[in-house]
Amino acid sequence: VITNKKAYKADMVILSAGIRPNTAFLEGSGLEMFKGTILTNEQGETNLSDIYAAGDCAMVHNAITGKPAWSPMGSTANISGRLIAQNIMGAKLGYRGVLGTAVCKLPGMNVGRTGLTEEQAALEGFHPVSVITVVDDKAHYFPGAGSFVIKMIADRDSLRLLGVQVIGAGGVDKVVDIAVTGIMLKGTLTDLADMDLAYAPPFSTAIHPFEHTLNVLMNKINGKFDTFTPAEYAQGAAEGYKVVDACLTPSIAGAPYVDLTTVEGPVEGLDPEEKILLVCNKGKRAYLLQNRLKFYGYQNTKVLEGG
């Protein structure tokens, strides 16, 4: 990459220039603006009589918070444009708002998100709780099977679903779209549990990745799954904990290894009173080991979410 100052070697170049509303021509029109966007109400009307605005130039609102939100997406433009057309013809329809839903295809993986992040949820007055899972994207024995890494955020008090982020080689958009449906209907984790989602080995797992993550989050909320998130671990929350390798085979250098299938009582070398951090490849075996250790009196265990 050659600039006016020097040349830079790179393995990959990402052009992320961003966009901005092209509304300079509206200066002096009397339209109420905010940072170059046209402010509208739920019907798509501006502050000027009989003038509507839609698309990348128009500000809409967030469906969860009700606050103004800029969503320069083709989907938003088409949905709000159709609504405005109906309102011009006499309807009185209100736009329900956006969730910041997005999907992106990267080399070898896909990324998607919708709703609030954990940080945004806290700023909006929710009591957020989240979980990170690593789950199969289809039956593990089926050709082309891979994994999703999913983060799900909900309000701890009401159990309302607030957001989802997912990355993986498979169809992340389906996980995102299920979450969008739940969030737009103000659904709780209880409302969305045990849904009869499409299943066949080429397409999904018997318990859908979305439902699997929801179940894990409910276990965490109900105190059945004691964890550190990767963020908590990075901030030093696991200081003073003994790391225990719970992988299928020994995989963590310097950490004592415990084979889940052999635990039938207290584990030699592990004090039931000490703080123990259980780590495996994806978090599942560590969770199963945590349950066994709890049964045998180990009450100070944590699992590293996501492995």
Language-model segments: residues:
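Short, well-ordered alpha-helices that flank and scaffold nucleotide-derived cofactor binding pockets
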Residues: 86, 90, 181, 291-295
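Conserved beta-strand-loop-beta-strand element in the redox core of flavoprotein oxidoreductases
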Residues: 1-7
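A short, polar/charged loop-to-alpha-helix boundary motif
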Residues: 170-187
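FAD-site-proximal beta/loop scaffold in flavoenzymes
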Residues: 7-83, 179-182
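Rhodanese-like catalytic fold shared by cysteine-dependent sulfurtransferases
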Residues: 191-201, 205, 212-230, 235-242, ...
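Mid-to-C-terminal Rossmann-like scaffold of FAD/NAD(P)H-dependent oxidoreductases
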Residues: 57-170, 202-205, 209-236, 241
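Redox-cofactor binding/interface segments in oxidoreductases and associated redox assembly factors
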Residues: 3, 15, 53, 244-245, ...
